[in-house]
A protein has these predicted regions:
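Conserved active-site segments centered on acidic
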Residues: 1-84, 92-107, 197-203
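Acidic side chains
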Residues: 67, 85, 168-172
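Phosphate-binding/catalytic loops
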Residues: 99-203
Length: 203
């Protein structure tokens, strides 16, 4: 059984670490003590290991009440992709990179915004209950991600892609003012709310 959410961006200094911390925060709100059954990690397709979070990203993370001091960047490896239950990327290009590294992860790999659309559609279409992992119909927290991915995949069949494919990408704010980082973290939270909501009701 696969497990955990892996969030991927380019350098693992801004988008993916901010998303990692926001995802943990939202999971804790939704699941309380059960959030530990859904671990969240991040990595970068071109990351250099051991760097702290970008200063603007660290400041915004701290403003949300989480201490980012322990964070260190780490490069993406195929084994991470093979074992993650759900892989969320900042961009379509990074999604392609992930699948190239680990073809078996194809059906578990989405951009953050893409999975948010699918999670919203799954809730609207009422397909979540069809995807409970426990054969006797009881909710099983350990299998939340399997059920959430299955529900999103079912919803995909009836959902049109965005008119502009780039709308599934999350813009990199590195090199821009902190206002752009604030916008980025708002977009991350907007994408993660339906995602975490789907995970919460799928177990």
């Amino acid at each position: 059984m696969l497990g955990g959410v892996l969030i991927v961006c380019h350098a693992n200094l801004c988008r993916s670490p901010m998303a990692e911390y926001v995802a943990r925060e939202l999971l804790t709100r939704q699941l309380g003590g059960e959030a530990s059954a859904v671990p969240v990690a991040s990595a970068g397709t071109h990351a250099v290991p051991g760097y702290p979070m970008h200063p603007h990203a660290a400041r915004l993370t701290a403003e949300r009440g989480t201490d980012p001091e322990a964070f260190r960047s780490r490069p993406l490896h195929a084994e991470q992709l093979r074992t993650a239950g759900l892989i969320l990327t900042a961009t379509r290009a990074q999604r392609t990179t992930c699948v190239s590294l680990a073809p078996s992860a194809l059906h578990r790999t989405f951009t953050l915004r893409q999975f948010a659309r699918l999670a919203t559609a799954a809730a609207e279409q009422g397909v979540v209950e069809q995807c409970w992992a426990a054969p006797d119909g009881r909710r099983d927290p350990v299998r939340r991600l399997d059920a959430a991915v299955a529900a999103a995949s079912r919803a995909r069949a009836g959902l049109q892609p965005p008119v502009r494919p780039e709308d599934d990408d999350l813009t990199d704010p590195v090199g821009l003012p902190i206002a752009e980082f604030r916008h980025c973290v708002r977009e991350i939270e907007r994408a993660l709310r339906p995602t975490v909501g789907l995970i919460a009701v799928s177990g």
